Amino acid sequence: MNIIIKKFGGTSVSSIDKIERAISYIKKARKAGYYVVVVVSAMGKDTDRLLKITAGLDDYKKSDDISSLLSAGEQISSSLFSILLNKNSIKGKSFQGWQIPIHTDLSYYNSHILKIETQHIKKS
């Protein structure tokens, strides 16, 4: 089975209704014979909201704590997306980058992916 990656940005996952619409695209891809890996952004403007909270903390923006803070939005949307996939009888499992794992260049605020280990994705 061929793998396809579907990426949904913040606007596409900003509400339950919009996530349900995104799931309709996943259903179509599965019907066409694809194994679908979904990548989601934080819901709506969550990342912008988190960045505003850190205004004035420029000295810390290159720390792993800022990356952890900013990833909170993606953790919420990926978990919710997975819940709704399962509600729609599509097996879903949310993963964070460290769980897969995804290896990066360790530039916390603007990382580049070096390697993705796919065995956990393939098992789920």
Which stretches of residues belong to each language-model region?
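Nucleotide/pyrophosphate-binding catalytic subdomain
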Residues: 1-124
